[in-house]
Design a protein with these regions (language model features):
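N-terminal leader/linker segments that precede catalytic domains of diphosphate-processing enzymes
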Residues: 1-116, 120-138, 142-166, 171-175, ...
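NUDIX/MutT-family hydrolases
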Residues: 180-214, 219-230
């Protein structure tokens, strides 16, 4: 593994360590790249919720189908896939939808120092919504009473932690005071969806490793998504969840799960 490299994204520095694959190819442009800049600005929370309903992703519509990647991971011999959930918490700040993110502690075993959505492993027989709300309360001090769960995004696989992750979208009332859990979360912050939709924010690479990854294409390549934000980098599973959220919010065809197929 290499350290943070300015040359990976020229002119952009970030504190995380991003692993080096055996082979890298350029990926596709952002699904929303063809949209006018005006269509990527002034996205409020109500618009995101409305789009979720239109795409059949409301809570009432039920869980979306499993991705081919997740099904492939579940078929791996001798591998136990751990069910998990994350909360895609949406705040409204001056009329703009923001998503709540965390920086994980550098002392953690998996995904140390990375930007993440609050969430974690399922406890007992609780469902994905209960898991996401509990984990957000434990990790960042978000009171479940201040969250209105409104929809689902596609469940995805985290190969690094052998997890099946169910993203739950929820709207947050007001401007909460965050309480990061020591030892798990270094800081809590939010990013405007409009900033993630900016022309220079998104990058896709296609990676190939010597050991085939479940869900890779016929040549062994799989997409890795990155969002460049000021002095930071969002990538991996979190970026994949955000790609689908932004695709739905902007009304474009295709989402993270479809791009994996």
């Amino acid at each position: 593994m290499s350290g943070a490299r300015a040359e990976r994204f020229p002119g952009h520095r970030y504190p995380q360590v991003v692993p080096e694959p055996d082979e890298v190819r350029p990926g596709a442009p952002a699904p929303w790249a063809h949209l006018e800049a005006s269509a990527r600005r002034s996205i409020d929370v109500a618009r995101v919720v409305r789009r979720l309903v239109e795409r059949g992703r409301s809570l009432e519509a039920g869980l979306p189908p499993l991705s081919q990647e997740l099904l492939a991971l579940a078929r791996e011999p001798g591998l136990t896939v751990r069910p998990s959930a994350v909360l895609v918490a949406l705040l409204e700040v001056e009329g703009e939808a923001h998503v709540v993110l965390t920086r994980r502690s550098r002392a953690l075993r998996h995904h140390r120092g990375e930007i993440a959505l609050p969430g974690g492993r399922r406890d007992g027989d609780e469902d994905a919504v209960a898991t996401a709300l509990r984990e957000a309360n434990e990790e960042i001090g978000l009171d479940p009473a201040h969250v209105s769960p409104v929809g689902w995004l596609s469940p995805i696989a985290s190969v690094a932690s052998n997890s099946a992750i169910w993203p739950v979208v929820g709207t947050v009332a007001g401007q909460p005071r965050w309480r990061p859990q020591p030892g798990e979360v270094e800081r809590v912050f939010s990013v405007a969806l409009a900033d993630l939709l900016a022309d220079d924010a998104f990058v896709e690479e296609r990676w190939r490793r010597a050991t085939p990854r479940p869900g890779a294409d016929d040549e062994g390549f799989f997409p890795i998504y990155f969002f460049r934000v000021p002095e930071d980098l969002i990538w991996g599973a979190t970026a994949r969840v955000l790609v689908e959220l932004l695709s739905i919010a902007t009304g474009v065809d295709g989402d993270a799960s479809e791009r994996l197929r």
